Structures are given as C-alpha cells and as structure tokens.
Regions:
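Bacterial signal peptide processing site
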Residues: 21-23
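Compact alpha-helical subdomains of small soluble proteins
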Residues: 129-142, 221-272
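Solvent-exposed, acidic/flexible segments
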Residues: 98, 185-199, 203, 218-225, ...
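Short, solvent-exposed, Trp/other aromatic-anchored flexible loops in extracytoplasmic proteins
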Residues: 108-172
Length: 272
C-alpha cells in the first residue's frame, strides 16, 4: 500500500512526511483492533455558555447522547440543542476561525469537573455557518461537537459545559495549519469527510483480510486482498492530491496526519 504524503500536526507543529511503499506482509495484522461503538447520556452543568457569546446563546436543558467510535482513531461526537436570542453580531471575530470553534465543550464528571482527555471538544466546522446565522435568528438549533480523542470513553462521564473559544488563541495555535489548508469555504467538507471515512474503513478491512491470510492462504481471500489493496492505494492518491491542492479544512488535515501516524505505528517505521 502506498503511504500517504500528509500534513501532520502534533503539539501544534506541522511536519511534512514523505511517501514510501510498504510490503503488505509487513502489516501489523496481530495489532488489529475491532471497531467499537459506545455512548453515554450527559446533562449540562449549566445552561449558560461562558465567554463572549454568553449574552446571545444558551444550552437548552435536557439529556444529550455522547457517541464514541473506535476505528483506526477514536472519535467523540455529541449534538446539543442551543437557544439563540438573535441579538448577536455575525461579523464578530469569533466566527473567523474555521478550525475548531467558536464553541468548545468539556465532558465532565458528576461534580462538573472536566475530564482531561475529553475536554475542549470544538463544535464541528460544518456548523460554523449555522452558528453565524444564529446570531441574528431567534430560536433553538442543533449544534454538533466532534473531535479525535486520546482515550476510551470515560466511565465517570455524566455532565458537560460549553464555553466560547478565544478566537485569537486559536489563530495563533493553528497558524501553521491555516496556510496549508482551505480556510475559505466549507462547500466540499462533506466530500472530503467521505473520502477519509472510506479510507479508514477500507484500511481496517484490509488488516482483517491480512490477518485471515496469515492464518491460512487461499486464492479467494488473496484476490479480495489485492482488490482492496488497490482501492486503498487509489484513496491514498486522492488524499495526496487534496493535500497538494490545500483542499482539506484544517481539522480534516489534522485527521489525515493522525491516520498516517496510527498506520505508521501499526506497520512499523516507514522507509524514507
């Protein structure tokens, strides 16, 4: 399988990783983890949204489901209903981020204390336009929050709280990412999300086939493996082109880098 030539962000630094080939027999089939899904119901610690948008937005009281999915990476998603009084400013600096805001959600325990590895979950960049419209529209709207997380779903998760993100801090933190990505339009984010989902799912299937071949060689499985390996190569090419064209939104580029990092761990250190 071809390696992905990616933009990789770690500790808010951007690294370029060169592509290389790997022998399918070197895939870490024994390290294959099954996909896993779980969820937990959370209540807001308060309806107040802290920060600069507190005078405009508030959380609608209720229970909300946090979904956790483990594939190559771990993902946490939650949709929260937010009420707007329509008295905000859509041209506020808060809405010029397009990476991870303007809202941030902390998953908390029963006492309302944030759980470290499930904190600062930004609202989905796909909802930034909706939030901007909410500044001048009175009503209740669903806003999604998602992120790649570093740990399993915490057993003590029970509540959450939302705050406004400091846009200037985000701009400084993600400055290197911005110049390498699409920060202008959200028109194609669904297209690129689908590409990355397809790549991640296909790679997991490829690992499963390789594990099966490691147990027993047979022509049918080998043929299926070869076809899927070709598909993954083609998806890699598409990802590389999107990186070259700076087509990914910043959080998508970060996801590509994290996928590359995880695959590198599973397959071993790539040849340069």
């Amino acid at each position: 399988m071809k390696r992905i030539l990616v933009i990789f962000t770690a500790l808010i630094a951007v690294h370029y990783l060169t592509s290389c080939s790997s022998n399918p027999s070197n895939r870490a089939a024994n390290e294959q983890e099954e996909t896993f899904n779980a969820s937990v119901m959370l209540k807001p610690t308060t309806v107040k949204i802290d920060g600069s948008l507190s005078a405009v937005l508030e959380v609608v009281e209720g229970e909300y489901r946090l979904n956790y999915t483990q594939k190559l990476l771990r993902y946490a998603t939650i949709a929260v209903k937010i009420r707007s009084n329509g008295k905000g400013n859509p041209n506020d600096e808060t809405f010029k981020d397009y990476t991870n805001g303007p809202l941030s959600l902390d998953v908390c325990d029963k006492q309302g204390q944030p759980i470290a590895k499930f904190s600062s979950i930004g609202n989905s960049y796909k909802d930034d336009a909706k939030l901007k419209e909410m500044m001048t529209k009175n009503g209740e709207y669903w806003v999604s929050f998602d992120m790649i997380v570093e740990d399993n779903l915490p057993k003590d998760a029970a509540t959450f709280k939302i705050a406004t993100v400091n846009a200037s801090d985000l701009k400084e933190a993600y400055a290197d990412v911005y110049v390498l990505c699409n920060t202008v339009s959200a028109a194609n984010v669904a297209k690129w999300d689908k590409l990355l989902d397809d790549f991640e799912d296909s790679y997991i299937q490829l690992e499963a086939l390789n594990k099966k071949l490691a147990r027993k060689q047979d022509a049918e499985t080998q043929l299926a493996f070869s076809k899927l390996d070709k598909k993954v190569d083609d998806l890699c090419d598409s990802i590389n082109r999107a990186c070259d064209e700076k087509a990914f939104a910043p959080m998508q580029a970060i996801r590509v880098g994290r996928l590359y990092s995880e695959i590198t761990k599973r397959e071993g250190t790539p040849h340069q």
